[in-house]
Amino acid sequence: MEQYSEACIEACIDCMKACNHCFTKCLEESVQHHLSGCIRLDRECADICALAVKAMQTDSPFMKEICALCADICEACGTECGKHDHDHCQACAKACFTCAEQCRSMAA
């Protein structure tokens, strides 16, 4: 496996962890209605990151397309999470944008 795919795999795993943590923390908030977009995108993002990791590890013929979609979803999740002041949302946004950048490189 090439070096750049290892970096992308690491970014996807980090993003998946950050999204899962953010998802859990958002559900613990007393007022969740303003976090519904964040919660929904955390799930989507964690799922596509897991799929992207699997695609890279198995050298899927659809790896580039999956990584491109992963980048799009990570950007959407990062943008949504970045709207919220919670530390977990800000950390998630950062991980999402890092993952999006790595996945864009893989998809190129």
Curated annotation (Swiss-Prot):
Signal sequence, renumbered to the chain: none
Database matches in Pfam families: DUF326 (PF03860)
InterPro entries cross-referenced by the UniProt entry: DUF326, YHJQ-like
Domain of life, source organism: Bacteria
Name of this protein: Uncharacterized cysteine-rich protein YhjQ
Organism: Bacillus subtilis (strain 168)
